[in-house]
Design a protein with these regions (language model features):
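Surface loop/turn motifs at the tips and blade-to-blade linkers of beta-strand repeat domains
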Residues: 12-17, 52-56, 89-93, 130-134, ...
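Beta-strand-rich domains and repeat architectures in extracellular enzymes and scaffolds
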Residues: 12-37, 59
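Conserved beta-strand positions in repeat-built beta-propeller and related beta-rich domains
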Residues: 32-37, 68-74, 109-114, 149-154, ...
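Residue-level detector of Asp-centered blade-edge/turn motifs that repeat once per structural unit
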Residues: 26-28, 63-65, 102-104, 142-144, ...
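Short loop/turn segments that connect beta-strands within beta-propeller blades
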Residues: 43-47, 80-84, 121-125, 163-167, ...
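A short helix->beta-strand "capping" segment at the edge of beta-propeller domains
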Residues: 1-17
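Blade-level signature of beta-propeller repeat domains, shared across WD40, Kelch, NHL, RCC1
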Residues: 181-227
Length: 227
């Protein structure tokens, strides 16, 4: 496994009225984060808060190219980001969620204390497969064929790239002591957005560069898990 120190390139926030960040997503223009009783959006170029949606937002947040998905207790809500209207609700895997990501037609749901990541059907909530971790899972993102998740245990947090078929840890970016990860998203390019829990901040972390050969060997989220 490759280990390195996380390169934090920018910090955003804290934002007015948002004391906690529990999930992060990116829609190509705005960063969205779960702030408890609201979904909040800000401009990653200026850092300026833009708008909020009144909806329970306690944990993971995801974007499928058109709609937002938000974890709230034991359910996942599909939201129109233009109107804020909840379009559909599906059950979340039992045990509480702590991360959410969209990947080529399915959702990945992280579970904090259960130390699991579930791939689920976004129409029904049915669990398609489960990956186990040896650390608390505090954020999930999928980008360029890579599955990453955040961890936060005691005073230590890291970003992990894992094999989506086996759960094997392939790479780790260690955050500085005391800097937590609560929510994780890729911008589709060279950085991650990491929620900062009760610091109320979102941090941009440089994503390791990789050649096309490495990317071409990545697994598809639809491939069956190995037992």
């Amino acid at each position: 496994m490759k280990r390195s120190k996380a390169d934090i390139v920018r910090e955003y926030g804290p934002f007015p009225g948002a004391d906690n960040v529990g999930g992060v997503s990116y829609d190509g223009r705005h960063v969205w984060f779960a702030g408890g009783d609201k979904l909040n959006a800000f401009d990653p170029a200026s850092g300026k808060a833009l708008r909020s949606i009144d909806v329970p937002a306690h944990a993971g947040t995801a974007f499928d190219g058109e709609h937002l998905f938000q974890l709230a207790d034991e359910r996942i809500q599909k939201i129109d980001p233009q109107t804020g209207r909840v379009l559909a609700t599906i059950p979340a895997p039992a045990g509480g969620g702590s991360g959410l990501a969209w990947a080529e037609g399915t959702l990945w749901v992280g579970q904090h204390r259960a130390r699991k990541i579930h791939q689920i059907d976004p129409q029904t909530g049915a669990v398609l497969r489960t990956i186990e971790s040896n650390r608390f899972v505090t954020g999930v993102t999928w980008s360029d064929g890579e599955l990453w998740h955040g961890t936060w245990e005691d005073d230590a947090s890291e970003l992990r790239r894992i094999d989506p078929r086996t759960g094997e840890v392939l790479e780790s970016l260690e955050m500085p002591p005391g800097v937590v990860v609560s929510g994780l998203e890729s911008d589709g390019g060279d950085q991650f957005f990491c929620g900062g829990g009760n610091s109320g901040k979102v941090r941009a972390v440089r994503r390791p560069r990789r050649g096309s050969a490495a990317s071409s060997g990545a697994a598809s989220p639809g491939e069956p898990a190995r037992k």
